Amino acid sequence: MNIIEQLDKEQMAAREAKIPEFGPGDTVTVQVWVKEGGRERLQAFEGVVIAKRNRGINSAFTVRKVSHGEGVERVFQTYSPIIESVKVKRRGDVRRAKLYYLRERSGKSARIKEKVK
């Protein structure tokens, strides 16, 4: 193991506790630190995870929501210090790893059924 991989592992271990297990189709709420002027505050972003990219410290996930009839997507770096917490609101039952087809859909056709345990 080279020194870069070792540093990545240490950084990931420090941030691991705040991130629960989730995947595509899950509805999550991400609490993000936002800087406005001279002050910082927490902002919630709730939506469906449409993609997840697992690349060690460079891991990321994309969350999509519809706000005022307009689709909004945001890509979060999984181990970023601006992410305060991630909460899974509901588990979705999907058969794909990337749910990009939801971009073309709206209304009832964009719904994802809930996973039954």
Curated annotation (Swiss-Prot):
Q: Which NCBIfam families match?
A: rplS_bact (TIGR01024)
Q: What does this protein do?
A: This protein is located at the 30S-50S ribosomal subunit interface and may play a role in the structure and function of the aminoacyl-tRNA binding site.
UniProt keyword annotations, A-Z:
Ribonucleoprotein, Ribosomal protein
GO biological process, any: translation
A molecular-function term among this protein's GO annotations: structural constituent of ribosome
Which family is annotated? Belongs to the bacterial ribosomal protein bL19 family.
The protein here is known as Large ribosomal subunit protein bL19
Organism classification? Bacteria, Pseudomonadati, Pseudomonadota, Gammaproteobacteria, Chromatiales
Look up the domain of life of the source. Answer: Bacteria
> What SUPFAM superfamilies is this protein classified in?
Translation proteins SH3-like domain (SSF50104)
A Gene Ontology term for the protein's cellular component: cytosolic large ribosomal subunit
Q: Looking at the Swiss-Prot or TrEMBL record, what is one Pfam family this protein matches?
A: Ribosomal_L19
User: Which residue spans traverse the membrane?
Assistant: none
Q: Which InterPro entries does this UniProt record tie to the protein?
A: Ribosomal_bL19 (IPR001857), Ribosomal_bL19_CS (IPR018257), Ribosomal_bL19_sf (IPR038657), Translation_prot_SH3-like_sf (IPR008991)
Q: Which HAMAP family match?
A: Ribosomal_bL19
Is Ribonucleoprotein included in the keywords of this UniProt record?
A: yes
